[in-house]
């Protein structure tokens, strides 16, 4: 039902400031999840289970991190048919993020530019929100570092967040690829990444012993990587037995949107313009990783065919963000059905 209403809702939402519309949508979905209204409005999405990272996903189409940074609307999003949900990015302490305005639509390109800067209520409130949710499907919890934490101490923030979210996560995503936290992408460098993943794997094993379960780790990377960087990252993932990789985050490139309103705004560009770059990284990763480390593909999915293209490039699962904002819940079912059709041919 909500899928059929979304085009009307979008017309009103797109007249608003992009971030105000985002917050209004989150409040509505959060309220719907708490009251049970979400179930009445739920989208009919067929089950298409698959097992990845040792987890069974209801279907291969998930919600990407960033839409629900505080995990405040998990039940509302769950009713829309996603096969898994990822929330965050969360940091140890609450922080406001970058000054507004910091989110801009580029409808001519099917794109969004954001420079949010990991605005969130902190990991303690995040955990409370996650615990309050009734959703029992696969839930990814995405962690990052505070803006005022020196990059040399970044591991401290990731380790702290990992310990706090571990008992409540199906998997944990290590976000080192946002362009909106100063120097964060330095952690994708070979030496920095090796040290960070070594520390996180050590912590993961100790937490697994403590809680009696191994929660997989996934690394989220940028599309703005050359071939050698992708190879180095793949080798580091294999060396540390990281369970998954998410490709990709937003891009700093503006080649596809030159001349459009807001194109020169600072921040990460998402949506259709990142589709090809994301797929290229997925193909390169898959060539290096094979089936040893599953890939979650995200970036520019606006149709079922787009989702299938991500899988054809080497992804095992996909996530939606900007396409979901433009297309609404109907995109979830379209992607699930298109992937299922491709598997039966």
Curated annotation (Swiss-Prot):
It is a peripheral membrane protein. Pathway: Pyrimidine metabolism; UMP biosynthesis via de novo pathway; orotate from (S)-dihydroorotate (quinone route): step 1/1. Its cofactor is FMN. One of its GO terms (molecular function) is dihydroorotate dehydrogenase (quinone) activity. Pfam families: DHO_dh. FMN binds at residues 65-69, 89, 142, 175, 220, 248, 271, 300, 321-322. GO terms for biological process: 'de novo' pyrimidine nucleobase biosynthetic process; 'de novo' UMP biosynthetic process. The keyword DNA damage does not apply. Belongs to the dihydroorotate dehydrogenase family. Type 2 subfamily. This is Dihydroorotate dehydrogenase (quinone).
């Amino acid at each position: 039902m909500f899928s059929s209403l979304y085009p009307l809702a979008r017309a009103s939402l797109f007249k608003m400031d992009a971030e105000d519309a985002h917050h209004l949508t989150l409040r509505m979905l959060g309220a719907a999840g708490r009251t049970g209204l979400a179930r009445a409005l739920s989208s009919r999405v067929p089950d298409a289970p698959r097992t990845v990272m040792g987890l069974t996903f209801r279907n291969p189409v998930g919600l990407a991190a960033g839409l629900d940074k505080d995990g405040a609307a998990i039940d509302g999003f769950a009713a829309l048919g996603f096969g898994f949900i990822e929330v965050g990015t969360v940091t140890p302490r609450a922080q406001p993020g970058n000054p507004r305005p910091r989110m801009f639509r580029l409808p001519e390109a099917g794109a969004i530019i954001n420079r949010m800067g990991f605005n969130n209520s902190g990991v303690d409130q995040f955990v409370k929100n996650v615990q309050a949710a009734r959703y029992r499907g696969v839930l990814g919890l995405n962690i990052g570092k505070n803006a005022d934490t020196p990059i040399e101490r970044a591991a401290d923030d990731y380790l702290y967040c990992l310990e706090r979210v571990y008992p409540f996560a199906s998997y944990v995503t290590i976000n080192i690829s946002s362009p909106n936290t100063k120097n964060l992408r330095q952690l994708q460098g070979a030496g920095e990444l090796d040290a960070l993943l070594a520390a996180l794997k050590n912590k993961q094993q100790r937490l697994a012993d403590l809680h009696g379960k191994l929660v997989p780790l996934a690394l989220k990377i940028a599309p703005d990587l050359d071939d050698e960087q992708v190879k180095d990252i793949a080798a580091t993932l294999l060396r540390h037995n990281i369970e998954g990789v998410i490709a990709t985050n937003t891009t700093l490139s503006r080649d596809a949107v030159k001349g459009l309103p807001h194109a020169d705004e600072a921040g990460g560009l998402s949506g259709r313009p990142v589709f090809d770059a994301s797929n290229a990284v997925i193909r390169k990763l898959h060539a290096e990783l094979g089936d040893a480390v599953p890939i979650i593909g995200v970036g520019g999915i606006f149709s079922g065919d787009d989702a299938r293209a991500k899988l054809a490039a080497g992804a095992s699962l996909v996530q939606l963000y900007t396409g979901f904002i433009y297309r609404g819940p109907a995109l979830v079912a379209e992607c699930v059905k298109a992937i299922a059709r491709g598997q039966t041919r």
